[in-house]
């Protein structure tokens, strides 16, 4: 028998001390035993050093707080749900979870309704909740998200008229109607949990109608009101805007009837009321019915302060009501006096219209004259050729009467 060679030095490097001296020559059996005795402690020590941390890691951190995919097997939802201590520990995080489905997943009755990967309680619950929220809307809360119901107990989608509300309003208002309606259904186990905190079953019927009423009622005021307001405003605008002075709104009706008649009297007859009628004071104090309608036409043409004097000129016939063939020449330049031009009526005597530029009056003076209701203007020709009273008094009907005559 040949003697066995000593063990190679690489197998003996694991020890801390120097390699032992070679064994004295002996039989092969003794040398083999010595080799085994020398190698076995090293192998055990080596294995314990390499594999020990792995075992300790698994035992110390199992189940890990944030399990990975390979550790999901350790947190079985069915085992966790039926374990009394684990359910108690997992209930607080789920009840306080801001996610709308947190409260539902603690119930044990949910295990049969939802796939195992989605209804988890206990230690590993929060992770599936965080990683797998999308499957929940169709399963437990289908109606609330406007999705087809998954169980016989869920209310039809038609009753849930607020698909967008769960995201815009507090959970209490959105989920309470579903909870009230789902109590007799397969998710009846959740009723006791939801009803104490946010259970208001009447809202299941009141919520959708309130939405429809809320949209229907605003529609009613918004729809009719724009139509009514313009309708109400239109009738009020003509009387307010057409006669500038303000007391004239009563006269446009009669004026419309008599508008064609007094076209010639202002030029042919010179009784004091017609001269006065052209002045702004005539419109303020109340004049013959025929003139306010004309003033309304004039007022519409020039909505400035200057329009107060032209009303009298419009009473002469240049308003929209008189025939278009009439022309009112300026007393100075003999050109036509248009509605859009500043014009002054000689109320004192000749009853002729004059352009403001032809009389040499400034805009500021013209504004003061037209805004003064009791002012009476006379042209230069009448002042030179006629005796014009310096003071005139307007009577109740707005007629001009000389102070010395009265």
From Swiss-Prot:
SUPFAM superfamilies, alphabetized: FYVE/PHD zinc finger
Protein keywords: Acetylation, Metal-binding, Nucleus, Phosphoprotein, Wnt signaling pathway, Zinc, Zinc-finger
A single cellular component GO annotation: beta-catenin-TCF complex
Segments of skewed composition (Polar residues): 164-179, 285-296
Major localization class: nucleus
InterPro entries in the cross-refs: Wnt_Signal_Transd_Protein (IPR052475), Zinc_finger_PHD-type_CS (IPR019786), Znf_FYVE_PHD (IPR011011), Znf_PHD (IPR001965), Znf_PHD-finger (IPR019787), Znf_RING/FYVE/PHD (IPR013083)
Motif Nuclear localization signal: chain residues: 41-47
Keyword Ubl conjugation: no
Protein name as it appears in the record: Pygopus homolog 2
Gene source species: Homo sapiens
């Amino acid at each position: 028998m040949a003697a066995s060679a000593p063990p190679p030095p690489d197998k003996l490097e694991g020890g801390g001390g120097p390699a032992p001296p070679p064994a004295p020559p002996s039989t092969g059996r003794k040398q083999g035993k010595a080799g085994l005795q020398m190698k076995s402690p090293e192998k055990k020590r080596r294995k314990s050093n390499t594999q020990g941390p792995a075992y300790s890691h698994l035992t110390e951190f199992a189940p890990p707080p944030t399990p990975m995919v390979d550790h999901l097997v350790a947190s079985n939802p069915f085992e966790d749900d039926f374990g009394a201590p684990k359910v108690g520990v997992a209930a607080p995080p789920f009840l306080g979870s801001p996610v709308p489905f947190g409260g539902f997943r603690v119930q044990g009755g949910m295990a049969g309704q939802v796939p195992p990967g989605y209804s988890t309680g206990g230690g590993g619950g929060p992770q599936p909740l965080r990683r797998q929220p999308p499957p929940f809307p169709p399963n437990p809360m289908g109606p609330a998200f406007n999705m087809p119901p998954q169980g016989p107990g869920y209310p039809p989608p038609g009753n849930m008229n607020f698909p967008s509300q769960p995201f815009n309003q507090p959970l209490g208002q959105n989920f309470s109607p579903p909870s009230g309606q789902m109590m007799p259904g397969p998710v009846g186990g959740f009723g006791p949990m939801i009803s104490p905190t946010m259970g208001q079953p009447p809202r299941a019927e009141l919520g959708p109608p309130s939405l429809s009423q809320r949209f229907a009622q605003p529609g009613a005021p918004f729809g009719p009101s724009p139509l009514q307001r313009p309708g109400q405003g239109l009738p009020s605008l003509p009387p307010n805007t057409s006669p500038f002075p303000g007391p004239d709104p009563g006269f446009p009706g009669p004026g419309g009837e008599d508008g064609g008649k007094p076209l010639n009297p202002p030029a042919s007859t010179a009784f004091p009321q017609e001269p006065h009628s052209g002045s702004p004071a005539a419109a303020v104090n109340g004049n013959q019915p025929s003139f306010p309608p004309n003033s309304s036409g004039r007022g519409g043409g020039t909505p400035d302060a200057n329009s107060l004097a032209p009303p009298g000129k419009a009473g002469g016939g240049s308003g929209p009501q008189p025939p278009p063939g009439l022309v009112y020449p300026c007393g100075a330049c003999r050109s036509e006096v248009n509605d859009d031009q500043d014009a002054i009526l000689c109320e004192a005597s000749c009853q002729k219209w004059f352009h403001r530029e032809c009389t040499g009056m400034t805009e500021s003076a013209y504004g003061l004259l037209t805004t003064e209701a009791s002012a009476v203007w006379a042209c230069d020709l009448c002042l030179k050729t006629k005796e014009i009273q310096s003071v005139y008094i307007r009577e109740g009907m707005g007629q001009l009467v000389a102070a010395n005559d009265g």
